[in-house]
């Protein structure tokens, strides 16, 4: 008999000296009439012990702290051996919560347990966005979190409706996912399973063999993220009119059309020599470099005390640097930089194939373009979650919670734990091709380029650039979509900028448009880490390095659970 599944949520107090759950709600996924809303954590945990089901909280890192705190204060201890009256957790070294498994005992060989998962890992969006994007017949409401609610507080009709909506939105969305066969712990795992189902597990294991941990560690040194760069020429200055273009599904488009690695790599010494059987390669290289005049910098060196990890470098400084580079990255670097004192050390070479992901991407692109609401959003999730799964870190050493003397939770690093890599070379080359796509487009617009962010280019002026004029389309895979045209803008650093965007009213909503069609402008604030509350205080006049405001919630572990303390946000 399959286990029941429930969407759950807590509402909690906001005082450091009075941290507790003042309301809970649960609703059965697939049976929305089976729900309850109450005002006692003890009552909820009694139900948890009796129900022995799978529960989903949206942001388990927050709600889970109250559950683990309760377990510790009621005689349960952490254990990964499945003993009675223990609980196990999956919490990453970075503090990401995935699961709490509470064991109450055994009936014969059957484990009596309730497992609690994070729905945010399956649906990585705010509840409000899920309701809107999935076109669900209800919306997330609002309540005042800071209202005094003493122990035993009777839930008001407004609060009741708010909690019910929250748990119902997630229950409906998860039900749709599960009915599509998307039943793994994370969106990435769902996507990888979907790909294996199309390819077959047997073929997957042949095409993407398990590499040893030492080899994976070496190859992983060539793995880098998206290209995010601000042109110094425009830094901290108000700019006039400009345009933004985004690649439609950047990573899936690279997976669809680029040559990508497969099979067991071959190690080579020295400089890679052309090999038609193994045309893709990762080269370990030591060199000094100087940026050529008129070129965008593309070299970024992390975990090195001599360089800022987020800065793209114009030269190598006083010492040669050692990097692991795909042939895609190396060719870009050779075009953009003068290289000196080059030493080719060794590397890995790979067979290549184009179209490994064609059937998978065709399937979900069809759904994305022919469906609306939930199915469309799930298709986008499937398309965008696969590439990163290939480069999952095999070091899964986690954190273990414990109760400190003051009644708050502490976390220690658990025993070292490793899993098999998936196939890191794939993640390495997909991201390399993605950077290549963005950087080559930006370089071709060198006299206009303001900013790049992974899949987008921001340009001065309002003419479509020559390099992309034949591949501009709002939907086609790998084409550039004209995202917006702005009247003025200001960029401070990576992921920190404001724009007045040209818009017109369509069916009561503001839509981006050309300057000729515009009836007004919409003020847009993009700033990593800045809350919507603080964004409302931003203007062109005060948007600068050093801007400071209260309104950033900082989680603090206290006796009973977690309190979000209002703290200062500063643009540095």
Swiss-Prot record:
SMART domains given in the database record: POLBc (SM00486)
PROSITE patterns: DNA_POLYMERASE_B
Region 3'-5' exonuclease and strand displacement activities: start-end pairs: 1-222
Region (Interaction with the primer terminal protein): 56-66
UniProt keyword list: DNA replication, DNA-binding, DNA-directed DNA polymerase, Early protein, Exonuclease, Hydrolase, Magnesium, Metal-binding, Nuclease, Nucleotide-binding, Nucleotidyltransferase, Transferase, Viral DNA replication
Function: Polymerase responsible for protein-primed viral DNA replication by strand displacement with high processivity and fidelity.
Assembly, per entry: Interacts with the primer terminal protein; this interaction allows the initiation of TP-primed DNA replication at both viral DNA ends. Interacts with DNA.
Family statement drawn from the similarity comment of this UniProt entry: Belongs to the DNA polymerase type-B family.
Name of protein: DNA polymerase
Gene: 2
